[in-house]
Structure formats: structure tokens, C-alpha cells
């Protein structure tokens, strides 16, 4: 089925109801929320109305091309405890009126998870995926940009045009997420699969397989947050296309570009010359333990003051 804007409202309403029912049954002391998708906005609303304090992970970031940007900042204002993954994001949360005493940068859970993930060998990936990985690998994901309506078709066509111009690469696409215009992107990908060899498409690879491919990939390309947040762990060369991640901190292994063919080609010619050795700015020690300990021991106060700068 085609995804429509009305579906977002329906899922948001459903999320509020489900969270409300869980709160009635479980009676939690705190609601922990990670990220900025519309589904969890419903959980934040239900928790706020039920007077349950909220601990929010990944606040303070910017994604100026997506609805997620406004959702993220809204959840920040609902929340009483904050875990940004970078000091720049911490500063932005303070700008939103949150008390610095409630904001803690312990690093990113994603970066920590990758550091602890058992990466699969190339031979194992070949068996699982039934693909002979005997050429350079390009890992690609392209999502709809929710604040750029009716543009997804042209945007994915430009990416496909660029990838079609390359030879001697294995291109592995993962599915776009469940947003408006997802079907437009999938339709173009299906056409591409039929035209060019060594193109593969997976609805979902799972975390371990995806991370393992990312480590050995020659290039990651698209507009997924994983390209910005996760590739620095391996220093994998990455092209971030368009505005979906615009505003996020960009590591030296990543280059931004516009949607058109020439911009993507220019970015490719630049990024292939860069070194892979870069530190992950979101990686710190004992991130999960520090977050969990703070959530358990923090003194929550539902009566929040606005912190003026």
C-alpha cells in the first residue's frame, strides 16, 4: 500500500494509546525514549500526560530536511533527563531551555554497540547473503526526505544514474524506511535491479550483517543516519546525499553533496582520495552502564523550570 501523510497521524494516535495502556499496567517510574521518529512522539505525549518523567537519548541533533527534527526538539521539551551523544548537541539542548544539570554526554549507544559487535568474516557474509563479494562493495540506503514532498522520484533516479555509471562494483541496497513516498523509491530500485548486474536489494539485513558489510565496504552512500552515526567507527568512506541529515556532525570520512548527478560524482571523486583512519566522535567508554546508572539514580522533578542563557 502507498504510505500517506494520514498514516502518520494514525500511527501517532495508536502509539499514544499503546503507551497509555502499558503505563497503566506497568506503572513505570520513568519512560526512556531514544531518537526522533513520530512513533515515539506518541510515547512521549502519553508519558507526559500520565506524569511519568522521561529520559531522552539522542536529543539536540539537527536533521533539517526531515519532520524528525521538530519531533526531536518536542521530545526534548517533554523530557526531564537528557543523553546527547556530543557536547555540541548538549549545548543545543541548553539553548532549548533545559537545565545543564539534567544533561549528560556519555557518548552514543550505537557507537558503543558497534565496538562490541562480533563482525562477520567476508566468507560468512557470502554464505548468508548468497553473494560472491569479489569486487568492491557499495552499501546504499536512500530514504524519503519528509520535508521535500514529491521529490523522492527524481532524487533516487539521480543516485541510480550515478551508480549505473560505475563498473566493477557490487552494490547492495537496503530498503527505505516506512515514510511517505517510500513506494516511489522502491519502484525505481526494482527497475534498477532488472537493468544492471551485481545489484542486490534487501528489505532488512539485521544489525550484525549490516555492520559487517559496512566494515568491508569501499563506500557507503545515501541519506541514512547510519552513514553519519555509524560509519566513523570503521572510517568507511561515505557520501551523504541531500538534506535529510543536514545539521548533524560530519566526521572526516564523510562528504556531503546535493542530489544531482554531477554533485554525487564530484563527491565520489573526492571521497575516494581520503584516508579511512578517523576517530568516532560519538564513542566513549561504558556508555550503556553510565546511562543506566544515571537513569536509576537521577532525582526527577516534574516541575521543570526554563533555563535562561
Task: Enumerate the predicted regions with their spans.
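A nucleotide-sugar donor-handling region in carbohydrate enzymes
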Residues: 78-154, 303
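C-terminal amphipathic helix plus adjacent low-complexity
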Residues: 272-309
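A donor-sugar binding/catalytic signature common to diverse glycosyltransferases
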Residues: 33-34, 41, 56, 82, ...
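Short acidic-hydrophobic, aromatic-tinged amphipathic segments that line or gate anion-handling sites
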Residues: 84, 104-106, 201-203, 255-260
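Donor-nucleotide binding loops and adjacent catalytic segments primarily
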Residues: 120-216
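Catalytic binding pocket for nucleotide-activated donors in carbohydrate/polymer assembly enzymes
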Residues: 229-274, 279
